[in-house]
């Protein structure tokens, strides 16, 4: 069947109509005859019997429409800063070359008139667009500072961006990658003064952009559209500061823009938890905690403060990091257009961090209906981490209907860590059950390699296309863990002490290959059919060898078979499906079904040989509806089902004895999960009043949800020949359970307050999570409810007066079926004000004051504290390019970091060591040189629509949506 389908598709390619008429031309500036790139060209049939052809001029000003039927047409050209151009043309039975078309600047541009009628936000199809000019900021503000003022967009203290209730995973600049997928690096290193627009949208996968069909691989994304007159020039800043307690911070960023060619450099070194980038954790070792006391999920609140200065070192962010870090980082980003057909971008990034932390944990473990156990832990840790990552993307447009896209990512990580832990297990926080003291020294390294090769072809017939993608993913992790532990167990009449001294050698590998063949065919004037075939092949291995210390030989040479395991796993899928779509640019619905056959094979080759082979047949559905309710509002509804296999570490049946009060193991009998997701989005934008409303609903269920089964020993039990589960100790393993539900809502309303020249954003939400679990073979359901409300008032006065007031409150209600009378309600609230006042002579004064309050946590964790950061400085040198700033962090010496984590088996409160008061003197020098830009702002913003409305697939092969 598949061979027939492939033969049919390539047969259609060969015998496609090759005699279609084309219309081409070259746009140029009427005054200096330079190419006009990024302009929007529309070709409309005079009798309106066809949907219009739309494309965008390339960097050489040229454009082409293919397969244009004979008839009379109107050619329209629009571009920001230029007068509209319209010309009537007649298409006969041959190709038409319109030659050079001169476009004159608009009268407003020639007279240098500033137009102030722009609106804060507007909806453009599936894209929400904010006008940067409508948000007044200080001259040294970054892209992150800008988006914080926009309704529906939030940035937490660690730099994570949320838009319309979803985490932003990618930020591009003029449609081009900037440091790969590192949204933090883009927003914190790009000055706000070069930004013209911020576009928020759901980015389809590269393959789905050809067809417009959502394949489930969408990511919430932001595209930054730069100002046309700032696309040729150099800009950036360098800074260096030194303070009390030997605190230091130095670094900078510089960008060289020459239209399509762009080179950016960033560098950073400090010991004040400043991180202007995101760090990838391939090894799973740099996140907080998880030393064996059980995995931790969720958590919120707390923080190390957030202080935004006015100079080059203005990213004073500590955020949710655990501990105090010394950081060194360097990165380079390159993007360019190699001729007319090749767009390329690439980046290299290195970072090294040395993090020290002192952590306290207070945990309540649910045991039975009437009893709980309590675990208290103190730990000291040091973590040295090294990351190298390379990203590369090449888009080769063979012609207007064919392209090849190559995307590559390579990441390396090396991590060395030391953890010293002291833990006590008790009954009712009085009667001691056991205690442990252990240290773990770990040396881990790994790499990941991801590569995608995608061929896309748009046929002359609009709506007919074919694409073939090939993906490879390689992941490798190796590590050595040295454990020294002493455990004490309190029995009724005796005290038992044991010691452990061992080395664990771990190796994990995963290789995955996948293909994706997609064919689309128009059905009538408004409908389209998609057929896809997607096989994938994944092979994983996990080897763990544990050696006890041999005192006689003075080395780790005694193999412990109870703690050693060699495990292989394969997961292969065959997926084929069909989707039907009907609609136009305003309204569209689609529905599809696919059949997936999956095989999950697990082979244990040591210490015993076992084989498990599972196969699954699933029907997966998808549906989408986009409705334009009015000129100001629209509604989108998305449904998709999917299946996901368990990881090889979840499957491997080997005991982890790092914390011998809490053992964990894998489960080779795990099944794949089946997930249903529904997303509803309502958007209302009133451009005339600059008002906006966003309301989102998310709902998901999971069958065979991978949860945890936790067993607390009521008496000593043997897990193996060398592992004893003592009374009061726990063993946890993953199991499949039904009943998982997650639901959440997000609402925000933005409006201007003209009488104080400010913007007010209200937000509210409700979330619910149902987590099933097993406690001593008894079902326990954790029901978590969260209610949140917040408001942000941000100034929009001038660059000399910038302030933001914010407030947020969270009420959390957690109930467990095993202990329904247990009160786990807690409340957190945060209020803050930031001010930045600047005089025309360069004197500035800044404040960042916040209050954090926690109620309902365990004793010692209920806190109410203030974090006050302040700075005063003077700008000097020509054009105020230099700056000297004196700042203080945590003026009141009250900074803290507190989180609460809730799972199906326990609730815990965590306190981490944080950065506290220091003073710093910082010098900053600003770089800024701009030439004449030649790229239209309005045109380049359409770059991200490649495969939708713009080049190269905006021609005959595209379905007009």
PLM ranges: what are they?
Residues 378, 512-514, 558-565, 665, ...:
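Outer membrane beta-barrel strand-and-loop segments of large Gram-negative receptors
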Residues 211-212, 277-282, 357-373, 382, ...:
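Outer-membrane beta-barrel translocator domains and adjoining extracellular loop/strand segments
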Residues 46-62:
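Short, acidic Ser/Thr/Gly-rich low-complexity loop/linker segments typical of extracellular
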Residues 47-50, 72, 76-88:
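A short, solvent-exposed loop/turn motif at the edges and junctions
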Residues 26-36:
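Structural motif
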Residues 528-633, 812-813, 822:
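Signature of Gram-negative outer-membrane beta-barrel scaffolds
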Residues 60-62, 76, 83, 90, ...:
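Membrane-proximal, glycine/serine-rich, low-complexity loop/turn segments characteristic
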